[in-house]
């Protein structure tokens, strides 16, 4: 810590250098959450919360797809059961999207350097890695899934003011279209 500033240190990217190789427009990353109650964290923990998360994603995609010139690729992680609940609903609503299925063993930033914009849907290590690597990223999440330690609140408040973090999919889509 220097002065009043705390850095967002990510041990997963120490000594990593990313060469930007931008070929595509938008990479939207999301997670297939389990539909059964599980550990207490600020993520969807059961089907009701997963529906909120899924509906926010669909709303964002509808807003982005209206007159959009952007090519959108969706990257998702499945849960331990191989559940594709959210993905199946997205595929029903949108026929022309590209999907990449990954697992948690591969680091997300390995895909991210190829895109003009990365959209994260949870306040996670992946979001912090992209910020620390200076790759273009925004976070779009519901406030019920957003929790920040007290010591980092000021940093995250600044990210909200600078339009790096959004809680409304429509506002985020309007910002992306600028």
Residues covered by each model-derived region:
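A general structural signal for short secondary-structure junctions and capping/turn motifs
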Residues: 16-20, 63-66, 109-110, 129-131, ...
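Short amphipathic alpha-helical segments, especially helix-boundary/capping motifs
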Residues: 34-37, 63, 101-104, 148-153
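Conserved catalytic-core segment of nucleotide-activated headgroup transferases in glycan assembly
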Residues: 3-89
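Catalytic binding pocket for nucleotide-activated donors in carbohydrate/polymer assembly enzymes
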Residues: 2-10, 21-23, 94, 116, ...
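Alpha-helix initiation/capping motif
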Residues: 24, 46-48, 65, 95-96, ...
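Donor nucleotide-activated moiety binding/catalytic core segment of transferases
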Residues: 10, 58, 70-133, 142-144
């Amino acid at each position: 810590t220097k002065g009043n500033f705390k850095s967002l240190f990510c041990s997963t990217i120490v000594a990593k250098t990313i060469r930007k190789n931008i070929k595509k427009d938008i990479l939207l990353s999301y997670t297939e959450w389990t539909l059964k109650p599980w550990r207490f964290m600020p993520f969807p923990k059961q089907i009701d919360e997963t529906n909120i998360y899924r509906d926010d994603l669909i709303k964002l995609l509808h807003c982005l797809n209206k007159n959009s010139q952007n090519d959108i690729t969706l990257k998702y992680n499945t849960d331990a059961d191989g559940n594709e609940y959210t993905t199946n609903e997205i595929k029903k609503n949108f026929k022309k999207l590209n999907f990449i299925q990954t697992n948690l063993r591969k680091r997300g930033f390995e895909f991210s350097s190829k895109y003009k914009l990365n959209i994260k849907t949870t306040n996670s290590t992946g979001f912090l890695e992209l910020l620390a690597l200076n790759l273009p990223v925004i976070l779009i999440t519901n406030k019920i899934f957003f929790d920040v330690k007290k010591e980092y609140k000021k940093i995250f408040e600044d990210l909200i003011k600078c339009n790096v973090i959004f809680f409304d999919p429509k506002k985020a889509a309007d910002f992306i279209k600028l």
